Amino acid sequence: MTQSSVDIHAISERVQQESLVVDRIFQEMDRVIVGQRYMVERLLIGLFCDGHILLEGVPGLAKTLTVSTLAKIVDASFKRIQFTPDLLPADLTGTTIYNQHQGDFIPKKGPVFANLILADEINRAPAKVQSALLECMQERQVTIGDETYHLEDPFLVMATQN
């Protein structure tokens, strides 16, 4: 056997193993989410490609339930952020809090420090908040005070808008 045929065989086995994992994810999702196979496929593509996703649709399509279910299935941390006109950038990223006992400021990390983030109704947020989220998505890090923190891997933002 040549070296290239061994590599092809190994690749073929790896693809078969990975497809079993994907099939298992679909089976688990189908137990909770009915009639949204297209959306589930797109969420998995985003997850596997390390990209971010914008989910558009009318209320009641189970967008939130789908994302939270996916997070449970892949054993990832999950946070849902409800975007409102009065939301501040620090509400996403976090801030420093004064600790009277230590006489020092300590960081309080925001909800972007999770693997899967559901940015619900992102179109309702002010531009500064959207900008803060876009920075997290692009740089995959957050600065709180003087410290920079790397976001967890995988880091996937799934934003919804109605």
Where are these regions (language model features)?
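Pre-Walker A (pre-P-loop) alpha-helix and adjacent loop at the N terminus of AAA/AAA+ ATPase modules
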Residues: 14-61
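Short glycine-rich substrate-engagement loop in P-loop NTPases that contacts/grips substrate
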Residues: 87-116
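P-loop (Walker A) phosphate-binding loop of NTP-binding proteins
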Residues: 58, 92, 160
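Short beta-strand-centered segment that lines the nucleotide-binding/catalytic pocket of NTP-utilizing
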Residues: 56, 77-89, 144-153
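Walker A/P-loop
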Residues: 8, 47-84
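AAA+/SF3 P-loop NTPase mechanochemical coupling elements
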Residues: 106-115, 144-161
